[in-house]
Amino acid sequence: MRIDIISVLPKIIESPFKHSILKRAQEKRLVEIYIHSLREYSTDKHHRVDDYPFGGGSGMVLQCEPIDRAISSLQLQRNYDEIIYTSPDGETFNQQIANDLSICYNLIILCGHYKGIDYRIREHLITREISIGDYVLTGGELAAVVICDTIVRLIPGVINDEQSALSDSFQDNLLAPPIYTRPSNYKGWIVPDILLSGHKAKIKDWELQQSIDRTKRLRPDL
């Protein structure tokens, strides 16, 4: 998989890709992640990429030309499965979307900033708009990191224990069951006996029931 991220402020998101699972996935050559500065595609002598909105109003809008140049430049080199725009208007990101994106070969993620992007880009170039929640961030960079982290860990070989990713919360629209580790008794806080019994079938049934109960209690919307 290859992921190209286009951002006005690329340095904001450089660090997360140099650590943990995202770093290991790149070292294993299971994913390539490139961060592109939108300003590099500006024809303005000051590398300006934004302007005031037509019709008035506050804030600045990212212009068509640099975004079009950035996306077109990448498309000349390869075909992309999706061109994603991180936006509070988009479909809410969830595990199913992550599963779908994890089997793609090439993705572009365009990070919104300021008041957003010229709507013509959304009409003519963007294939999918994704929101990570009903709130507004300063820019779409953090959303891009969330999307990348979520989908990359699903790529076969990224996580050594692939069952770990498949058993995460939301994979089957259920929250994960409670998990515990040693010691079994800490300050009188006791691990449920069933988990110490060694009966795998009973443990599996217990975990499923716990997942159902927790989902009903904490996330009935699921």
From Swiss-Prot:
EC primary class: transferase
Any Pfam family matching the protein: tRNA_m1G_MT
Binding site for S-adenosyl-L-methionine: 112, 132-137
Gene Ontology biological-process entries: tRNA N1-guanine methylation
Subcellular location, record wording: Cytoplasm
GO MF annotation terms: tRNA (guanine(37)-N1)-methyltransferase activity
SUPFAM superfamilies the record matches: alpha/beta knot (SSF75217)
Gene Ontology cellular component terms for the protein in this record: cytosol
EC number: 2.1.1.228
Keyword annotations from UniProtKB, A to Z: Cytoplasm, Methyltransferase, S-adenosyl-L-methionine, Transferase, tRNA processing
Complex and partners: Homodimer.
Similarity field: Belongs to the RNA methyltransferase TrmD family.
Protein function: Specifically methylates guanosine-37 in various tRNAs.
Protein name: tRNA (guanine-N(1)-)-methyltransferase
Source organism (scientific name): Azobacteroides pseudotrichonymphae genomovar. CFP2
Lineage: Bacteria, Pseudomonadati, Bacteroidota, Bacteroidia, Bacteroidales
